[in-house]
């Protein structure tokens, strides 16, 4: 019984860190927006404030890795000290959010990404409980001796897996989207969603009707399109010219760059929610989001031929399943490596 009780704090802390790290890591772009909000409130500028996505990836990977290390039981004393330090920082931050007039301007801490939000009071209570668990865990392992580097392979696997989760989502867009504009979402059912023409008349319903007759490819951009962007879109423009798809640009008022495309406008918050990248495109078929691509890494041709819209929708239809298999495979490798090390492998 005592053995079970000794493992309670590490298991609870590990589960919480894994959940928090993965929920943020599956959408590091959204976490970077929250970090930018913090930097703005704190008045930070320069290198740190200029690279929020990089810090977001580090934060998500760090939380996920710490949770996996707690669950695997390697380097227990070092991990326990690290957990106390992290929870002390998080608790201090949420106390500032809860009681500082400036902190109250931040709507939520972003602990669980876009999956769900907690009020400042609930977040502070959660962190106080987790901090107490971290101190309890440190007390439990205080007398344990150092076992050298045994466990380094498990640690390496945890680090690689934890870094891969946010990096994949940052580059190739979230495979699981908790926002209302994810793959499979009906755009017309999203409250407050609107797209406008050059006269600022709403054309959302008209565009959804167009997508009912043939797929609508909407380029989503928060900046002017470059020559390289237009080159990558040439295959899609050719499909539009052949009448197989409809093609347009959704951007900010005042920006153009359509280069022959119909240009429509919406607000910046909507653009950031539609696509977790500065510029990319989404395929809407029958009013339903079927596929998304980050234009910065999009390859317009494979094996000497252009990638067709139908291929992209088929690929994205099976994306959650493939992603789930990869995650389970990564976890299985970590369990296998940990078991080998526990059996005496070095």
Walk through the language-model features, giving the residues of each:
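Short active-site neighborhood of thiol/selenol oxidoreductases, capturing the structured segment around
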Residues: 206-226
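Short, internal strand/loop/helix patches
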Residues: 247-250, 258-280
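Selective detector of the "anchor" transmembrane alpha-helix that sits immediately C-terminal
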Residues: 315-341
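A short, hydrophobic beta-strand/beta-hairpin element that forms part of a small beta-sheet core
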Residues: 278-293
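Functionalized membrane-embedded alpha-helices
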Residues: 3-25, 52-96
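Membrane-embedded alpha-helical segments of integral membrane proteins
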Residues: 88-143
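Short, aromatic-rich amphipathic segments at membrane interfaces
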Residues: 294-322
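Internal/C-terminal transmembrane anchor helices
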Residues: 147-176
């Amino acid at each position: 019984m005592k053995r079970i009780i000794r493992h309670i704090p590490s298991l609870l802390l590990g589960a919480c860190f894994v959940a928090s790290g993965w929920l943020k890591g599956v959408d590091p772009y959204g976490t970077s927006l929250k970090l930018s909000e913090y930097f703005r409130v704190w008045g930070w500028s320069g290198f740190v404030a200029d690279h929020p996505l990089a810090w977001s990836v580090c934060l998500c990977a760090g939380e996920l890795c710490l949770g996996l290390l707690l669950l695997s039981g390697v380097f227990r004393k070092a991990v326990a000290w690290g957990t106390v330090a992290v929870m002390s920082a998080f608790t201090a931050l949420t106390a500032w959010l809860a009681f500082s007039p400036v902190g109250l301007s931040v709507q939520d801490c972003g602990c669980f990404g876009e999956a769900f939000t907690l009020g400042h009071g609930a977040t502070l209570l959660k962190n106080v409980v987790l901090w107490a668990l971290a101190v309890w865990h440190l007390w439990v392992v205080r007398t344990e001796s150092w076992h050298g580097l045994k466990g380094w392979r498990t640690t390496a696997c945890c680090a690689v897996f934890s870094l891969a989760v946010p990096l994949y989502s940052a580059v190739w867009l979230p495979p699981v989207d908790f926002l209302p504009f994810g793959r499979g979402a009906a755009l017309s059912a999203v409250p407050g969603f609107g797209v406008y023409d050059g006269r600022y008349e709403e054309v959302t319903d008209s565009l959804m009707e167009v997508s009912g007759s043939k797929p609508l490819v909407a380029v989503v951009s928060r900046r002017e399109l470059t020559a390289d962007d237009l080159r990558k879109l040439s295959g899609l423009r050719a499909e539009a010219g052949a009448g197989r798809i409809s093609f347009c640009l959704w951007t900010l008022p005042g920006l153009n760059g359509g280069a022959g495309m119909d240009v429509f406008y919406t607000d910046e918050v909507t653009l950031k929610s539609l696509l977790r990248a500065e510029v990319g495109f989404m395929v809407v078929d029958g009013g339903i989001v079927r596929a998304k691509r980050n234009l910065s890494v999009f390859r317009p041709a494979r094996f000497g031929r252009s990638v067709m819209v139908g291929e992209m929708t088929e690929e994205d239809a099976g994306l959650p399943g493939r992603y789930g298999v990869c995650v389970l495979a990564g976890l299985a490798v970590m369990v296998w490596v940990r078991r080998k090390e526990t059996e005496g492998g070095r």
